[in-house]
Amino acid sequence: MIRAALLLVLAAVGCATVLPGPRVDASVAPSPAQRWIPPQPLPASRPPEPDPALVAQIKPGMQVTLQQLLAYALSNNPQTRSAWLNARAAAAGATSRRSAYYPSVELDVQAGYTHQSFAKGALTFDQWALTPSAQLTWLLLDLGGRSADVEEADRLLQAANLNHGAAIQDLLLLVEQGYFQYQGAKALLTAAQASVKEAQTAYQAAEERRRAGVATIADVLQAKTQLSQAVLAQQQAEGNVATVRGALATSLGVSATLPVDVADLPERLDVQPLGETVDKLIERAESQRPDLARARAQALAVASRADSISSRGLPKLVLGANASRSYYLDEPWVHGDNYSAAVTLQIPIFNGFKDTSDLLQARELAKAARADTETLEQQVILQVWTSYQAVKTAEKRVGSAQDLLAAAQQSSEVAQGRYKAGVGSILDLLTAQSALANARAQDVQARANWLLAIASLAHDTGTLGPPAGEARP
């Protein structure tokens, strides 16, 4: 027997020295200068399919309203879906923590064979047995550990739900920003097209005057330059419209290639002054911002974790019970029963300062979480202040831009009439047309910026919500 064991050990040692070690060359790139190529192409995820209800709205001449876009995005965007699923997972985790208050019951079935020999084999004993058993373990008292764990799980669930609310508000702002930016881009394109037409009119007028001998080739070239610049601006505006439209479609959770169309930017806005002071808006944000409430819940969860760790060093009272029956298969109808029950008092003494270190770590993390919450509170105040000032500025710019546009239109009309009458220069006409193009752009940007500022302020104060009474498109 000893010789056989020695031979087995020597064989194992020999295999260890002969067998090759682990090789990694085939699993990584050949060199630092070459990229790794997977042996098989990774499966590509399918692009999201737009909902038929939304596709029905995407037809030539049909425009989707902001309420329809918001309702569709809420039900289709993967970011809000991910936040909702995380909240459901947190709810399951909270339920799991409560299981510590219930007893644990386990059922085992053991089948075995026993051979014993005595007096150098003169007496032997062989037996087959089948033994089912049941064990019960129940933590009766732990002086706060389970309650702290449940409190932590509840706070994490609260934070997950608030994170879902923050994701909804972020999505609503993203869609509204895309919607208003799309409207603004379309309005800028319309303004650029009008500038091209006016530049063409000026170019034709310069050509006619040159043929009549009352204008020079320099006038024609200046008008041609103005026309080329207007065409370039129009082409840039067309590209911006396509880009912003793709961003809006992406915010809905569909492909950027979906040809979404929306209504034009309103020519006149009912600009109403803000009815609340910035202090009131900040107070509202501090009480309604879901991301701020989420940070507070996470800080409380970390504090509960510290309470749970501190309870590890306290005594625990555990109830244990066991019942089993052994059936001896070589002797039918013969069995043996075992029953036991005990209440155990567990008192931790020493574990290498692990609990002390874990508690210190948890308490420092709790302090850091509170500091992060304070930082976020300051950021929220700054965001509300910035959005408030943006709205106030946008209110003024809307009126000023309209006055600028009206004056520029009159100036352009006068300059065009004077040039055709032969009493004005081409430079005066081109200058007036350039000022008109700039005034159109300023007017469009002022209107779009006011709408964007209102949406941002609603988001920053935590009051931006889904449309009421709107069905999915």
Language-model regions, residue ranges each:
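Periplasmic alpha-helical coiled-coil/stalk elements that build and connect Gram-negative outer-membrane
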Residues: 16, 162, 166-284, 387-390, ...
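Sec/SRP-type N-terminal targeting helices
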Residues: 81-82, 98-99, 140-168, 218, ...
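A short glycine-centered flexible hinge/capping loop motif at secondary-structure junctions
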Residues: 210-214, 419-423, 460
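Terminal intrinsically disordered/low-complexity segments used for targeting and assembly
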Residues: 1-72, 238-284, 458-473
